[in-house]
């Protein structure tokens, strides 16, 4: 059973996150291992496994990028384990330039420049995310997979910038 079915949701990117949360709570109550403490060893093991599956499904579907990756996996794109790289040279050059800029910001310890950088990267991420949503809505799986790969780069860059921000604030 796929994660969408487990939560009673249609297998599409845009989901009702409130329904996801409510169903998660229901499933957790229903399959919590403590409820099977007096059961047989097989029942206890099944409850632990079911609870782990529910938690994994919840973590996957509640985050936009992992939800997209999972949806693509249902259509034959295993982005989690693939060695496929982004072939868009202009995008890769842009990423190198942004990484260099982040390194320069770290060296200069320029808070204002870092704040501006984070906002710019967030705008880039949001634009790609919207592009990915449209591609998934239109079942453009190849294009969506490529956009997810690019979003991973931007997500890592954003995370690095936020870590630098925390580091600079600690001084």
Curated annotation (Swiss-Prot):
Keywords: Chaperone
J domain mapped to chain residues: 2-74
UniProt keyword Transferase present: no
Keyword Cell division set for record: no
Any GO MF annotation of the entry: protein-folding chaperone binding
Disulfide cross-links: none
GO CC, one annotated term: iron-sulfur cluster transfer complex
Gene Ontology terms describing biological process: [2Fe-2S] cluster assembly; protein complex oligomerization; protein folding
Transmembrane segments: none
Pfam families, per database record: HSCB_C (PF07743)
Oligomeric form and interacting partners: Interacts with HscA and stimulates its ATPase activity. Interacts with IscU.
NCBIfam families (alphabetical): hscB, PRK05014.1
Annotated family: Belongs to the HscB family.
Task of the protein: Co-chaperone involved in the maturation of iron-sulfur cluster-containing proteins. Seems to help targeting proteins to be folded toward HscA.
Entry protein name: Co-chaperone protein HscB
Gene name in the database record: hscB
